[in-house]
Amino acid sequence: TLTAAFPTTTAASLASLGTGLPPGQHGMVGYDVLDPAQDKVVNMLGNWDPGVDPRRWQPFPTVLEQASEHLPVTTVSLPRFADSAMTRAALRGGSHASGTGIHARVEAASGALAAEKRMLMYFYFNELDKTGHRYGAQSPEWGGSLEELDSALKRFTAKLPPDTLVLLTADHGMVDTA
């Protein structure tokens, strides 16, 4: 069972998933946080301040780093996330494969899996979350994005050996507020 930590923001949740620790331990407690060393607010997702070292901010070994001592590890996500501060803080370890769209990432993931007998893969889909934040979780756009994700996952899992374990999770839920 996976239990969401509080707060259920993308930064806090991805860091908890990546480290196995609650936000109070790994230090990535929200979208924007105060960096006491600089006495300024820094963004934990995409716009880290150059004065903040992601490995110092979140110094604990990640699940991916620990697993890579025993088997191949690959992260599949958008190209811009390959060496992002968020990745270096919370999801570092192993190799990276990328694709600009859902279907391109499915192909990249399938290729990475075909090259190894056993592996741990972290596969990130951001499109559904992005669409929900922009249009709302009850919108036709969100429904279309969910259908596209479902289709991609069906294509991806159809290629997997029958003894493959696939875990699907989200970094947070979504409720329309306006």
Locate predicted features.
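Intrinsic structural disorder
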Residues: T1-L2, A178
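His/Asp/Glu-rich, glycine-adjacent segments
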Residues: L2-M119, Y124-H133
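Hydrophobic/aromatic residues located in beta-strands of well-ordered beta-sheets
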Residues: V73, V166-L168
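Short, glycine/charged-enriched secondary-structure capping and boundary segments
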Residues: A89-L91, G136-Q138, A178
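Structured core elements
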Residues: Y122, L168-T169
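A long, amphipathic alpha-helix that forms part
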Residues: L128-V166
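Histidine-centered active-site microenvironments of extracellular/periplasmic hydrolases
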Residues: H172-A178
